[in-house]
Amino acid sequence: MNSSLVILYHREPYDEVRENGKTVYREKKSPNGILPTLKSFFADAEQSTWVAWKQVSPKQKDDFQADMSIEGLGDRCTVRRVPLTAEQVKNFYHITSKEAFWPILHSFPWQFTYDSSDWDNFQHINRLFAEAACADADDNALFWVHDYNLWLAPLYIRQLKPNAKIAFFHHTPFPSVDIFNILPWREAIVESLLACDLCGFHIPRYVENFVAVARSLKPVEITRRVVVDQAFTPYGTALAEPELTTQLRYGDRLINLDAFPVGTNPANIRAIVAKESVQQKVAEIKQDLGGKRLIVSAGRVDYVKGTKEMLMCYERLLERRPELQGEISLVVPVAKAAEGMRIYRNAQNEIERLAGKINGRFAKLSWTPVMLFTSPLAYEELIALFCAADIAWITPLRDGLNLVAKEYVVAKNGEEGVLILSEFAGCAVELPDAVLTNPYASSRMDESIDQALAMDKDEQKKRMGRMYAAIKRYDVQQWANHLLREAYADVVLGEPPQM
């Protein structure tokens, strides 16, 4: 039986392990993000395929077993791995994706690298994904393609399956037209996205940026515009947009556009919070603090995440307000990049240098101002930190959405706490009750940390309660249901909940 739902995502849905000489799939250790929700749709479809890449040696490639069935799901669900050599992965993911596309998407054009990019390899791998996806798909299947790594897959799928439904979701920011058009491959990328039936983005601003790019490169016509949904802030912040283009015409095709940000999984997070082991960890953290106020700034090592600017602001805080020395602690869990991601080496060195400088200047025998962790924390440990934290300091220079901010709010369950959030994080237009700040302006950063530290408990609860209600209303399940409704998919997944 052919697949009615095909998901294209660069990661496999399960961890692949060897047990007793046999390859088996196990649930991923970290349950956060969109993978659990994608897997639920993958498992519920009548017949489905998940296409991802798998790094193999050149020798393994010759007799590689591409298809794996999932224990407990019978023959209904297939994970199809596209075998790539280490050299292909390096050029496709570590260099072309991260050194050429990533800086442009996040509006850091001075970080853009052209000479080392391998466009031919990128095209080839996208074609391999499309061919793997189409191999046993229904002619009118829904192909759900994820993110910029697979920009070219929609056009290749359309060529192979002209009647298919193709939905693309862009998980990163989509930059302004003058920034995006720096890419020398811009026409091919836009041509492929215009082969979709639906292009989804986190927020209205990214939709409008895409429309501006498409209109600058192709003879497209805007056929429908609407006022933005009440879930989005329409004006007054850096990424606000009052109106949204929801349909384009390109030749004889109509392309639907929409803004529907990825949500988190409140039920899962609350279940983790309720665990005895997590509650014990929260108590231990608070005991170790000894009455100090805890600030958490979680993320990963990346120049777009603003960790350097946040640490510089923290240093200024301790200088400006010496009475806070010994009274507050900053915990910075930022997972370092995988080996081979050379673009992030300087960012990590700078973060480590600044943390060391702050500790060298201000530390006492009884107090360490900054606790920096670059090894990944277990998800339950991170949630425990959020529960214990008085303030979450999430101030990226640019971020497509930022689920960490939402996870902090859910972990606090509408109780006391303060979220400091960059205006340049996509979720800022969903969470106006955060203390919004401009990480490019040191004075605004200083004002925001002062405001957070001074906020009274009643105000904290009011703000956190409103943010929690908004996040619960539009969780990750709603996000996925939204896409399926928009794509008019012939996939039986039960009645989506009402929004």
Curated annotation (Swiss-Prot):
> Does the entry feature the keyword Glycosyltransferase, yes or no?
yes
Q: Identify which top EC class this enzyme belongs to.
A: transferase
Q: Which InterPro entries match?
A: Gluc_glyc_Psyn, Glyco_trans_20
| Documented EC number(s) | 2.4.1.213
Q: Write out the pathway annotation from the protein's UniProt entry.
A: Glycan metabolism; glucosylglycerol biosynthesis
Q: Which reaction is this enzyme known to catalyze?
A: ADP-alpha-D-glucose + sn-glycerol 3-phosphate = 2-O-(alpha-D-glucopyranosyl)-sn-glycerol 3-phosphate + ADP + H(+)
Q: Please give the Gene3D superfamilies that the UniProt record associates with this protein.
A: Glycogen Phosphorylase B
**Per its UniProt record, what Pfam families does this chain match?**
Glyco_transf_20
Q: Name one GO cellular component term.
A: cytoplasm
| Subcellular location(s) per record | Cytoplasm
- Whether Glycosyltransferase counts among this entry's keywords is yes
> Which UniProt key words apply to this protein?
Cytoplasm, Glycosyltransferase, Transferase
Give one GO biological process term. Answer: glucosylglycerol biosynthetic process
- One of the record's GO molecular function terms: glucosylglycerol-phosphate synthase activity
Instruction: Describe how it is modified after translation.
Output: Seems to be degraded, at least in vitro, by FtsH2. In an ftsH2 disruption strain inactive GGPS accumulates.
What's the family? Belongs to the glycosyltransferase 20 family.
> What is this protein's function?
Involved in salt tolerance by producing GG-phosphate from ADP-glucose and glycerol-3-phosphate (G3P), an intermediate in the synthesis of the osmolyte glucosylglycerol (GG).
On assembly, the entry states: Interacts with GGP-P.
Under what name is this protein listed? Glucosylglycerol-phosphate synthase
Q: Which organism is it from?
A: Synechocystis sp. (strain ATCC 27184 / PCC 6803 / Kazusa)
- Upper lineage: Bacteria, Bacillati, Cyanobacteriota, Cyanophyceae, Synechococcales
- By which gene is this protein encoded? ggpS
